[in-house]
Amino acid sequence: MTNYYRIMLGKKSAHFPECSAGGYIGSGFGDIVRDVSGELTEDFRSFSQRFMPEMQTLHPGKSKIALGLWCGFAWTICKNIRVGDLVLCPDGSGNYQVGEVTGPYFYVAGGNLPHRRPVRWLDRTGKRLPRRESSFGNLHP
């Protein structure tokens, strides 16, 4: 079964052009600048327990809720999204772009959004709808 995920590629999807050109989605993951391949757990709770202390050290002024959300997004990008799932991402021009995840997590040292998944961006856009009316039925080729 294909799952759909709405993602942001940086604040206001500022990194979308780079991600689109490079064929990937990614997460900055709170300044954790190392490959976490060997630390990806099957469940979010274990992942969060592993990384929350490190996140609190890196960002002592952030709330546990904010750090938990950060961990949740990183885990979703790095582990939870499956090959074949679709991602919907704002492109900065008022539309959503659609991509299909094509491979596993990889890390790019020194890159923007270094925690990445390969994506094949599809030739589809979706108009932004008010939240209460949102659906995936408005995608068109």
Q: Predicted regions span which residues?
A:
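Short beta-strand-centered aromatic/proline hotspots
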Residues: 94-107
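Short, well-ordered loop/turn sites that connect or cap secondary structure elements
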Residues: 80-82
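Short, solvent-exposed secondary-structure boundary/capping segments
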Residues: 105-120
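Glycine- and charge-enriched low-complexity intrinsically disordered segments
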Residues: 119-141
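Compositionally biased, charged N-terminal/linker segments
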Residues: 1-73
